[in-house]
Regions:
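Extended, highly charged
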Residues: 1-136
Length: 136
């Protein structure tokens, strides 16, 4: 089972490279990201993990479709797709306690106080009926 997002993405890239798509050109978070995902699904019948590296207005990338297929979700859970329900229920019945660490990958970038600016995060508008941009 993948222990974190990075190891999961590395596993998808290595074992299912056709299911990982990197978009290197700049995209607009207002409608364009969602339009790209929908177009790929409708025209090519594909739902790969999508990494948008350059998102207008932010220094952060955007990822989508992380678990958009049963086989990828099963990969993340470390099981066969037909065993997903059993694996998930077993995990819920036997939870693993969180482990606090002083350093680690989750602490690569630490912002505190005035350095924290939520407006720096990508704010996506998915559809015309959205109330505006939001963080997902």
């Amino acid at each position: 089972m993948s222990q974190d997002l990075r190891s999961y993405l590395d596993k998808v890239r290595a074992e299912r490279p056709e299911e990982f798509l990197t978009v290197s050109r700049e995209v607009d978070p207002a409608y364009e990201i969602t339009a790209s995902i929908v177009k790929l699904e409708k025209e090519a019948k594909r739902r790969p993990v999508m990494l948008f590296e350059k998102v207008k207005g932010t220094d952060f990338p955007v990822m989508s479709n992380l678990h958009a297929s049963r086989p990828r979700l099963a990969m993340a859970l470390g099981c066969n797709p037909r065993d997903m329900q059993k694996t998930f229920l077993a995990a819920m019945e036997n939870p693993i306690a969180p482990k606090e660490v002083n350093n680690g990958l989750c602490k690569d970038v630490v912002l505190k106080g005035a350095a924290v600016d939520m407006r720096a995060l990508p704010q996506v508008v998915h559809l015309g009926g959205d109330g505006g941009p939001y963080i997902t």
